[in-house]
């Protein structure tokens, strides 16, 4: 008595089709599918943004020292 049989669900489906029509149900389905697709793309974008960028390479002091030496030589 607690669950409905297949015939109950078919009658409910027929009433829904008669009330709303197939065109509105099709539009509702495509709108719902688009919303789910947009949500999934939004979640995928959020995951890509949350990944940290790779660490930058450290600059050695040698190149800075050579630049200073070059500037000192041009001043003399």
Swiss-Prot record:
Biological process according to GO: protein transport by the Tat complex
Lineage: Bacteria, Pseudomonadati, Pseudomonadota, Betaproteobacteria, Nitrosomonadales
Protein origin, superkingdom: Bacteria
GO-annotated molecular function: protein transmembrane transporter activity
Segments passing through the bilayer: 1-21
Subunit structure: The Tat system comprises two distinct complexes: a TatABC complex, containing multiple copies of TatA, TatB and TatC subunits, and a separate TatA complex, containing only TatA subunits. Substrates initially bind to the TatABC complex, which probably triggers association of the separate TatA complex to form the active translocon.
Keywords: Cell inner membrane, Cell membrane, Membrane, Protein transport, Translocation, Transmembrane, Transmembrane helix, Transport
PANTHER family: SEC-INDEPENDENT PROTEIN TRANSLOCASE PROTEIN TATA (PTHR42982:SF1)
Protein's UniProt name: Sec-independent protein translocase protein TatA
Organism: Nitrosomonas europaea (strain ATCC 19718 / CIP 103999 / KCTC 2705 / NBRC 14298)
Repressor found in the keyword field: no
UniProt biased composition (Basic and acidic residues): 64-76
InterPro entries: TatA/B/E, TatA/E
Region called Disordered, residue ranges: 41-76
GO cellular component terms listed in the entry, alphabetical order: TAT protein transport complex
Topological type in the membrane: Single-pass membrane protein
Primary location group: membrane
Family: Belongs to the TatA/E family.
Function: Part of the twin-arginine translocation (Tat) system that transports large folded proteins containing a characteristic twin-arginine motif in their signal peptide across membranes. TatA could form the protein-conducting channel of the Tat system.
Subcellular location, record wording: Cell inner membrane
